Structure formats: structure tokens, C-alpha cells
Amino acid sequence: MTMKTITLHPGAVTLADLAAIYWENGTAKLDRSFDAGIEKAAARIAEIAAGNAPVYGINTGFGKLASIKIDAADVATLQRNLILSHCCGVGVPLPENVVRLIMALKLVSLGRGASGVRLELVRLIEAMLEKGVIPVIPEKGSVGASGDLAPLAHMAAVMMGEGEAFYEGAPLPAGEALAKAGLTPVVLAAKEGLALINGTQTSTALALAGLFRAHRAAQAALITGALSTDAAMGSSAPFHPDIHSLRGHKGQIDAGAALRNLLEGSEIRVSHIEGDERVQDPYCIRCQPQVDGACLDLLRQVARTLEIEANAVTDNPLVLSDNSVVSGGNFHAEPVAFAADQTALAICEIGAIAQRRVALLVDPALSYGLPAFLSKKPGLNSGLMIAEVTSAALMSENKQMAHPASVDSTPTSANQEDHVSMACHGARRLLPMTDNLFAILGIEALSAVQGVELRGPLKTSPELQKVIAVLRVVVPSLEEDRYMAPDLKAAAELIASGALVSTISGGILPKLEA
């Protein structure tokens, strides 16, 4: 399969560009109109390196060692030593699509023409993406300030022929992987090592991955929530557009509209409009637009933050428009840390309200006539009893992981870097959190579809019938107790892959861009 290549325009890269790289394992290259700006900044750095004036990152030590002047003859060694000494990551490798996103984001940052690297480095990153030389980057080791030093050092090391890289699915010594791909390691010039590792690209890539996954889950939650509403014979009256317009939150308005459209044409819904003795549904049914809509608004706010950060220069020092080279602090990932914490809250709440809907459906005291645990023969069979327990376990695990990472800080590097963002692990936890959420929503899908089928011969809406058909291809109806783990896995995969979301007609589910 031919990979999609995204042409990046630094300063104007979109979420859609980045999502294509993440979801489709795409490649990326810079628009060639940015070459001149890159070369201009590189020439300025070369000029400084040839002189005697000390400039941080070019001919000085790093961090607490910034006051030590480095001889011109040692500038290349300085950059090589920087990368090797900073390769201190631990843990399992980051997923390949996350690393591809890291590399693309680094291209964007370098492409702004403020980092002072040669075009040779940019072309090597592009070629590595194209040919599938993907650095092995351990998941842990960054505190999210002075950039994501350790993880980005592992990326830079591969460019030098050091460390490890995945090539054709296998981890290889970096030099071997480059050679197999027909690529040559680079010898870093002045400031280039620092430009490669001094940035927020790892934290931002992980936060983007979490955002994309959380938005997919948010869309799926509206589908499973609509199914649960019909399974429980819940009222669609609380989804009336005027209710949500009177409050005014865009996410709530969009979520309410999605639920209405998903339920349109349901025989089940029509069957109990008249003569239903219930006055109001529990909040997990009635307040879906308010909860899922608030989560959608939060994710959209995160999207704006991360789109800005994806286009940012987060290197230090920077070559400014007047050709001066100035030290700053753009490497501090506080905006990304906040965005990751916000995403975690949304993930947690989407799962929390979905889990309560599962609990409602399996409880005959709440489900308005459905059998206990959605089993046709309760007692002899336990039905979805323990599937609901699993959803509760995953919900509580996500609550624990949702504790803000950004409120923590610790001084590092001999107190030179005395306040840090913790953005990297704050963003990294979004991956297991969304895995849990996909599983919760998969369990809701199993429960709700089982419940809808038990309402037969009445049918749900045409849109939701399409969802049921897709689910039943991989998970048959639960007639008797059986080994359940494969069913839960298959349902979660339908959510995670986007297969469930893609069954819904265009324009119904809310997009990430408001």
C-alpha cells in the first residue's frame, strides 16, 4: 500500500495533516518554498561558530554548563556528545505512528527557519520517513522542559548512525537500518544537535495522538449512547434543540443534534412516546448532551492549543528575523501539559457516563423490562454481568490516571531547569486511557445492541441498525453464556479502528474543528 505523503507548510499545518500522519502512518516533507529561510538561519549559525563570541548552544556547554566556552575545533564533537549523553530514555518504545508524528513535527519546527540547521538534516528526516527508518524512542525520560531532551536525542542519534531504528518492522542498529534504506548518517554541525532535541515534539505528538483517539471515542460514545437510550426505552425529548440553544454551549448543541439524528426513525422510540409512566430518565441517559458536549468543547479547545504548538518553533536559542540569536524558553511545554490534562478529563468523563449506562442496562430495576444482565435465561446464565464489572474497573483506572500531571514539578539539571511541565508523561498516559475508553464503549455497544434486540420486533433507527449490522459481523448475539474475552476485544477494536464511527452517515457526528 502506498503511504500518503503530507506536504507541510510550517505555520499553517492543520490537524487534518497531522491526523493523516498518525492514523495512516503517513510520510511528510516540507514545502520547498521554506528552504531559503532554513539556509539563511544556518548561514548565521555558521558565521557565529567561526567567531570568538560565546553564544549558548553554538560554542558553549549546555544547561548548567552554559558558561563554559568551547573551542571552534570542538564544535562538532560538542554536538555529538550532546546527543549521545542525552540518550537516557527508558521503557518500551513509543508506537511507530507516534514517532512518525514526532519526526513530522520536528520538520515543521525546523522549517520555520529559526533553528539554524542545514537543509541536509531536513532532507534526512524526510528520507527516513519516506523509507521507513523509524527511530526506537523509549517512552520515558522527559519532564517536558528544556524540551523533550531524552526522547528526541534517541531520534537524533539514529540520524548520526547511533542507537536503534525500526526498519521493515524489525529493530536494527541505526547504521544498519540507514544503510538498508540507502541513507547516510549525518555529522552534526554547530547547534544542530541542540536544535534536534530542544523542542516539545514528543509531548506534542503524544498529546495529538491522545486527542485524535479521544475524539474518535467521543463520536463513538454518541453512537453507543443513542443505542443505550433506545435499549432502555429512554426519552429523546431531552435532546430537543431548543433546550441546548438556551444554554448556548456549542459542544452541547452538537451532541444533542447528533443524538436526535441517530435516533431518527426508531420504532422503539415512537412506541413509548405515549403512555410511559416514567417522568424522567436517569442522568446517564438524559444528560448525554451536557456531559458529552462539554467533553467535545474541551477537546476542541485542546485541538486549538495543539495546532498552534504543532506549528511552533520550540528550539533554543533562536535565530530571529533581524538575524540576532537570542535565548528564550519556548521549549517549556506548559501549554501541552495543560492540553494533555484537559484531554484526560474528557476521556475520564466520557467513560464514566458510558459505564453508568452499561450499569443501567444490566439492572432489571432500571432497564424498563429488560432481563437481568441482558440474558435470555438469567440465573442459568450470567449474561453481561462481569462485562459490566470490567467496564467499572476500567472507568476507575481512568479516574486515577486523570489526576493532573501539570501540577507537579521538580527542579532538574542542578536547579538551572527548576520548573518543568511534566507534559510528556501527561500526554503519554492518554494512550492507555483511550485504550480503556475504547473497551468501555465496546462493552456499552455489546450491552446496548443486546438490549435493542431484546426489544424486538420493534426496530431501532436506520442509522443504528447499520451499527448493529457491523457489530454482529464480529460478535454474534448472546444466546447462552460463552467465553467472553474475544467479544470484548472485538467490540473495542470496532471503536478504536473507527469502523463503528464510519458506519454513520456524514454530517451527523460532530467534528473536532467546531
UniProtKB/Swiss-Prot annotation:
One of its GO terms (molecular function) is histidine ammonia-lyase activity. It catalyses: L-histidine = trans-urocanate + NH4(+). PROSITE patterns: PAL_HISTIDASE (PS00488). It is an enzyme of class 4 (lyase). Disulfide bonds: none annotated. Pathway: Amino-acid degradation; L-histidine degradation into L-glutamate; N-formimidoyl-L-glutamate from L-histidine: step 1/3. Its main location: cytoplasm. Keywords: Cytoplasm, Histidine metabolism, Lyase. It is found in: Cytoplasm. One of its GO terms (biological process) is L-histidine catabolic process to glutamate and formate. There is a cross-link at A145-G147 (5-imidazolinone (Ala-Gly)). The keyword Lyase applies. Pfam families: Lyase_aromatic. The modification 2,3-didehydroalanine (Ser) is found at S146. One of its GO terms (cellular component) is cytoplasm. Its EC number is 4.3.1.3. InterPro entries: Aromatic_Lyase (IPR001106), Fumarase/histidase_N (IPR024083), HutH (IPR005921), L-Aspartase-like (IPR008948), Phe/His_NH3-lyase_AS (IPR022313). Contains an active site 4-methylidene-imidazol-5-one (MIO), which is formed autocatalytically by cyclization and dehydration of residues Ala-Ser-Gly. NCBIfam families: hutH, PRK09367.1. Belongs to the PAL/histidase family. This is Histidine ammonia-lyase.
